Amino acid sequence: MNYIDLKDKSEAELLAMLKEKKLELFTLNAKQKTMQLTNTSELRVAKKDIARIQTALTAARAK
């Protein structure tokens, strides 16, 4: 997911995506704690996606 893909989306779409990504991060953290997560780089990717979405939200609200 790139910032370019996100900057054209509406605020409602971004909020929905943010909620979905936070839920995904929660499940990944739970899997890591129970030693079920094999690819730990998914955590980093999810965190960066959340940061990108929050940046796009801030830019959308500033307009």
Swiss-Prot record:
What PROSITE patterns does its record include? RIBOSOMAL_L29 (PS00579)
Q: Which GO terms describe its cellular component?
A: ribonucleoprotein complex; ribosome
**Which InterPro entries does the entry link to?**
Ribosomal_uL29, Ribosomal_uL29_CS, Ribosomal_uL29_sf
Domain of life from the UniProt record: Bacteria
Is Ribonucleoprotein tagged as a keyword? yes
Q: Name one Pfam family in it.
A: Ribosomal_L29
Which BP terms from GO are recorded? translation
Entry GO MF terms: structural constituent of ribosome
Q: Which NCBIfam families match?
A: L29
Give the family per the record. Belongs to the universal ribosomal protein uL29 family.
Cited HAMAP family: Ribosomal_uL29
Recorded protein name is Large ribosomal subunit protein uL29
